[in-house]
Amino acid sequence: MKGSLIIVGFFVLGIIVGVCDVVPAGLLDGDVSYDVLCCLMFCVGISIGCDTSVLKSFKDVNPRLMMLPVMTILGTLAGCAAASLLLGHRQLTDCLAIGSGFGYYSLSSIFITQYRGPELGTIALLANICREILTLLCAPLLVKYFGKLAPISVGGATTMDTTLPIITRCSGESFIIVSIFHGFCVDFSVPFLVTFFCSL
């Protein structure tokens, strides 16, 4: 949760700096968000390439549980489609793009800002931070009422890093590999799904 609060803090700081009009003009003229996005994608690629032990551990995952990331993605998109019916002022593709962040707020919000503008990018940032915080705070209740896979599915792309400790504590150590596999697959889908829905 500390990491989420730091991200929100920088976001608020950026708003304050923008309102106070103290940003150098040259910085605003350039396509800074695109440059940051390229650097972020490069770092994500490095982290996946360097951690080969994670890829090797996936062979121990129960074949039935390999469907969990697919169910998480489909369930999230179905929920976003339903939400778009209630939010008449938002397009279906906007809601699907936001939901396709799956808790990966840093990457998805930059993509959405790039394609659809800062307003939708801000909504994506806050929505995906809320998903992570919901997992961190409600994991015990999710296990109690919906089963041990529930916090993994709710955690989305965060289950291989920030929410892994709470999932391990609530669901048990036997779900560590499942959680990492789930997070890896959902995480991998984010840039493809977000850009797909943003381009529609």
Predicted regions and their residues:
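C-terminal ends of transmembrane helices
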Residues: 23, 46-57, 83-84, 110, ...
